[in-house]
Amino acid sequence: MSTEKINLDIHKILTLLPHRYPILLVDRVLELEPHKGIKALKNVSINEPFFQGHFPKRPVMPGVLILEALAQAAALLTFAEEQPKDPENTLYYFVGIDGARFKRVVEPGDQLILNVTFVRYIRGIWKFKAVAEVDGKVAAEAELMCTVKTADAAP
């Protein structure tokens, strides 16, 4: 991914995604190439609220939240592809996940690197290949399908 690298800080991310604490799971975009892919990161802190119950004696980031982090990175790539006319009223919905696999636990102190590659766009559905890594090792991977709607439209 490297012809034109776009780097987004948390301030720009907050203008593009409707998510807020505790569910905003992208801290920074390291690289973004429209029509190709995105590389983003999530710094995983012991202060994450989900660690209180998952699991108190051995905190592990829930796999579903790793997938959510990948979906949020995909949303940022989508919004780079197709700028929403009304960002305040635009939502990004999951419509499917294929081949989700979890290969390594993600623990407090890890830096989760989110790599999402554009696969195709057909009839309002975006498809992506998504891989989350820690220290260069795959933690999770999946194919994600998503759509963009206005907040007042049914998903």
Swiss-Prot record:
This is 3-hydroxyacyl-[acyl-carrier-protein] dehydratase FabZ. The gene is fabZ. It comes from the Bacteria. Its main location: cytoplasm. One of its GO terms (molecular function) is (3R)-hydroxyacyl-[acyl-carrier-protein] dehydratase activity. The keyword NAD does not apply. Its EC number is 4.2.1.59. Involved in unsaturated fatty acids biosynthesis. Catalyzes the dehydration of short chain beta-hydroxyacyl-ACPs and long chain saturated and unsaturated beta-hydroxyacyl-ACPs. NCBIfam families: fabZ, PRK00006.1. It comes from Burkholderia ambifaria (strain ATCC BAA-244 / DSM 16087 / CCUG 44356 / LMG 19182 / AMMD). It is found in: Cytoplasm. Belongs to the thioester dehydratase family. FabZ subfamily. GO terms for biological process: fatty acid biosynthetic process; lipid A biosynthetic process. Keywords: Cytoplasm, Lipid A biosynthesis, Lipid biosynthesis, Lipid metabolism, Lyase. GO terms for cellular component: cytoplasm; membrane. The active site is at residue 54.
